[in-house]
Amino acid sequence: MLSPKNTKYRKPHLGRLKGRASRCNQIAFGDYALQAKERVWLTSRQIEATRRTLTRYMKRGGKLWIRVFPDRAVTAKPAETRMGSGKGAPEYWAAPVRPDQILFELKGVPFQVAKEAIHMASYKLPIRVKMLCRNNNENNNSV
């Protein structure tokens, strides 16, 4: 699973996800893309499960780019612990995702294979997603 090698702060503030994605909202590398339509904190497990689904359906053909990286530590306190006594320990890594942000890109596979792979991968994510195509001959479908 993805995690940063080192970070400046071990327990960052959570912050808020406001607005839409102004960066990473257009296809940069591949021919097809998986675009988020809602805001969410994607965990490294969800990103890895989606990556495995995409690569397995493409039968390891073509190329896959992961455009999000889980670089924020999410903390949690143990169950049945009294309030206070500081912030909890880092539990897992997450990536903040805003609406219209590109999550994955594909290249080197036919349109039908990419469409079905993205459709299957959408079940691994907790948000609604949309498929984008670089050339506008194919339809852009919400999955």
From Swiss-Prot:
GO terms for biological process: mitochondrial translation. Part of the 50S ribosomal subunit. Keywords: Chloroplast, Plastid, Ribonucleoprotein, Ribosomal protein. GO terms for cellular component: chloroplast; mitochondrial large ribosomal subunit. Coiled coil: none annotated. Belongs to the universal ribosomal protein uL16 family. Pfam families: Ribosomal_L16 (PF00252). It comes from Cyanidioschyzon merolae (strain NIES-3377 / 10D). This is Large ribosomal subunit protein uL16c. Gene3D superfamilies: Ribosomal protein L10e/L16. InterPro entries: Ribosomal_uL16, Ribosomal_uL16_bact-type, Ribosomal_uL16_CS, Ribosomal_uL16_dom, Ribosomal_uL16_sf. It is found in: Plastid, Chloroplast. It comes from the Eukaryota. GO terms for molecular function: rRNA binding; structural constituent of ribosome.
